[in-house]
Amino acid sequence: YENVKYNAQLIKPGLTFREFAEKAWRLPENCFDNHYPCQIHGVGMSDEWPFIPYPDKDYSNGDYSGIFEENMVICVESYIGEVDAYEGAKLEDQYLVKKNGLEKLSSLSLDLT
């Protein structure tokens, strides 16, 4: 929940995908090799554009040249689970990028308190 919330607050029109990837919440080292393929994706059948992967050390594993734009609909996603563990948590919220930030479109709260 914390990483979805943290990553969502970074996004605004004009932010590049590379800037987002550099500032995004970092997965714990013992979970990194088990991460979901992307941190951000568009809406569709399966991880549509924009597709922002968890970056490798030199950012060679994806195209980070895009820019967040007003009226873009995105999903902020996370999976955290240790490698070889039986359990983990996969969370996702959908947002509309607006002039002054994001409007949450998903209605289910991820807060367990």
Question: Could you tell me what each predicted segment is?
Answer:
Residues 1-113:
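Active-site neighborhoods and metal-handling regions in enzymes and metal-associated proteins
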